[in-house]
């Protein structure tokens, strides 16, 4: 991949081992990009890379419950993140659920791809679209739906 990406890494406590393992499996690729992590997640990835002699550019924010999710969301809003990997613990309640939902919402609103499991993270990081200069992601359409106009647009023009 030629383009240097800005990638956010976030994981709940019960998913931290999973995201570190994913990062190590993708270390060659990730080491070429700028990484942003919530406090503990970013630190764990950085330490795992350092122990293996892998150079990395990782900026650690606060931990999620202390505002790290909100800091990542602010980067998303400013278009300073190209994609996010957020391994969520769906089996246990989180004390900072509002911040989690805010981060997910801002990614959706600002059209920033977010992977919430390993498979989607693998697909995202290996996508050829990152280097396709002709590909321009279309912004989401937030407008009232006009069914009549939509159906008219589908008609074949002769």
Curated annotation (Swiss-Prot):
Pfam families (alphabetical): MGS
One function term, GO molecular function aspect: methylglyoxal synthase activity
Catalyses which reaction(s): dihydroxyacetone phosphate = methylglyoxal + phosphate
Domain of life: Bacteria
Keyword NAD: no
Homology family: Belongs to the methylglyoxal synthase family.
Function: Catalyzes the formation of methylglyoxal from dihydroxyacetone phosphate.
Protein name per the record: Methylglyoxal synthase
Organism in which the protein naturally occurs: Treponema socranskii
The encoding gene: mgsA
